[in-house]
């Protein structure tokens, strides 16, 4: 009888630890979505963040993290015949998340202008050199630091579309400055330009 009580109290303690661990994970995810993830960058990376209002074509691949606005992206799309924008999350490593470097290489191989735009600072400082400038959504105009919200608002401005922006569809294609569509895969976005 005493043995069963000891065993059940061990299970109770185990369940408490599992519940606490699960709660900690959920609350950290909640906090990351609610706080400005800029402060998760290392201090030396924070110094590399540069707000810019000029042409994207003038930016250099120099390890700086350039904050851009929707108008800069629209201007870039008007200046180039075929553009695919990749709305990427540097820390998002789930299945089917395309590496930003691979995206740039695939676009170059297909004669398409690549525009990878990060939607979060989380691990952005760990992205290896892309061959194009590292671009980040400047979220201040949207008066929110919640990445899901400012990402939707940013792409709504970029596309000039009243359609709902789905954050899981990470590729946006433009032909001669005209928004074609929002796609789940690079292949779908590329096909839309042909």
Q: PLM features: residue spans?
A:
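Short active-site neighborhood of thiol/selenol oxidoreductases, capturing the structured segment around
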Residues: 74-102
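Post-signal peptide N-terminal segment of mature Sec-exported envelope proteins
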Residues: 39-58
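N-terminal secretory signal peptides that target proteins for export/translocation
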Residues: 1-12
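Thioredoxin-like thiol-disulfide oxidoreductase module
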Residues: 122-167
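C-terminal motif of bacterial Sec signal peptides marking the signal peptidase cleavage site
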Residues: 25-28
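Structural microenvironment flanking redox-active thiols in thiol-disulfide oxidoreductases
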Residues: 85, 96-136
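A short, hydrophobic beta-strand/beta-hairpin element that forms part of a small beta-sheet core
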Residues: 166-182
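Bacterial signal peptide processing site
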Residues: 30-33
């Amino acid at each position: 009888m005493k043995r069963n009580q000891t065993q059940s109290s061990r299970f109770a303690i185990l369940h408490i630890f599992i519940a606490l661990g699960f709660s900690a994970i959920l609350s950290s995810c909640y906090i990351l979505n609610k706080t400005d993830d800029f402060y998760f960058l290392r201090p030396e990376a924070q110094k590399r963040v540069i707000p810019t209002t000029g042409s994207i074509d003038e930016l250099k691949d120099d390890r700086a993290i350039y904050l851009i606005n929707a108008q800069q992206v629209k201007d870039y799309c008007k200046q180039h015949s075929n553009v695919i924008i990749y709305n990427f999350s540097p820390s998002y490593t789930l299945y089917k998340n395309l590496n930003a470097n691979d995206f740039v290489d695939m676009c170059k191989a297909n004669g398409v202008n690549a525009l990878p735009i990060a939607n979060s600072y989380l691990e952005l400082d760990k992205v290896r050199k892309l061959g194009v400038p590292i671009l980040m959504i400047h979220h201040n105009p949207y008066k929110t630091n919640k990445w899901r919200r400012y990402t939707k608002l940013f792409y709504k401005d970029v596309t000039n579309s009243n359609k709902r922006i789905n954050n899981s569809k990470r590729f946006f294609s433009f032909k001669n400055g005209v928004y074609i569509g929002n796609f789940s895969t690079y292949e779908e976005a590329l096909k839309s330009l042909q």
